[in-house]
C-alpha cells in the first residue's frame, strides 16, 4: 500500500474538487451507484435523519445460493429509481454523515493501490491540505473495510450460516431478511 505522502501527491496531481453535480449518486450503468455501508455508518445516518434501519439500507443485491443456503454480504444504501434515496436534486441530504465511500469518491484504495474513477471533479485544483485530508480519509476507509471484511470472513469460516432462509452476513453477524 502507498504511503500517506505519496497518496496525497497522486491526489494533488490528479486534482479534485467536488462539483456537487450528483452524478456519482445516480446509476449510469447497472449497479454503478451501489453504496456499501457498515453498521456504524447506518447508525450515524439513523441518528442524523431519524429514519429506521430498513428505510436507510437494504441487503446487497447479489445473493449467493448454495444448496439450502441463501445469503449476501453486507448492506447498501436504498435507492429510489436510478438514484440514491438521499440525493435531492443534486445535493446530499446526509452530507455531514455520508458514508466513507461517498466521502472518498472518486478515489479508492485497495491492495493494488490507488484507483481514480471517472468524475467531472477530477482535474480541478486541490490544495495540499485538502489532498492530505482526502488521503487520510482513503486510508481510514481502507482500514475500516479491511476490518469489516475480516469479521465477515470469520463468520463465514465458523460455518454457522443457517439453511432455509435468506440472510445477510455483515461484520456484526448474521441477520435474517425477507428477500
Language-model features: locations:
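Short loop/turn segments that flank or connect secondary-structure elements
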Residues: 1-179
Amino acid at each position: 500500500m502507498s504511503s500517506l505522502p505519496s497518496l496525497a501527491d497522486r491526489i494533488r496531481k490528479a486534482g479534485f474538487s467536488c462539483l456537487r453535480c450528483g452524478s456519482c449518486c445516480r446509476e449510469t450503468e447497472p449497479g454503478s451507484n451501489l453504496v456499501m455501508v457498515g453498521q456504524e455508518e447506518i447508525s450515524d445516518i439513523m441518528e442524523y435523519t431519524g429514519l429506521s434501519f430498513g428505510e436507510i439500507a437494504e441487503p446487497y443485491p447479489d445473493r449467493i445460493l448454495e444448496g439450502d443456503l441463501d445469503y449476501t454480504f453486507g448492506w447498501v444504501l436504498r435507492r429510489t429509481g436510478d438514484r440514491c434515496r438521499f440525493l435531492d436534486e443534486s445535493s446530499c441530504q446526509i452530507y455531514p454523515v455520508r458514508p466513507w465511500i461517498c466521502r472518498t469518491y472518486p478515489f479508492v484504495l485497495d491492495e493494488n493501490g490507488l484507483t481514480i474513477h471517472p468524475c467531472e471533479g477530477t482535474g480541478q485544483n486541490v490544495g495540499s491540505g485538502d489532498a492530505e485530508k482526502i488521503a487520510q480519509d482513503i486510508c481510514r476507509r481502507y482500514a475500516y473495510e479491511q476490518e469489516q471484511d475480516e469479521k465477515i470472513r470469520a463468520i463465514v469460516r465458523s460455518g454457522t450460516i443457517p439453511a432455509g432462509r435468506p440472510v445477510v452476513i455483515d461484520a456484526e453477524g448474521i441477520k435474517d431478511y425477507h428477500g
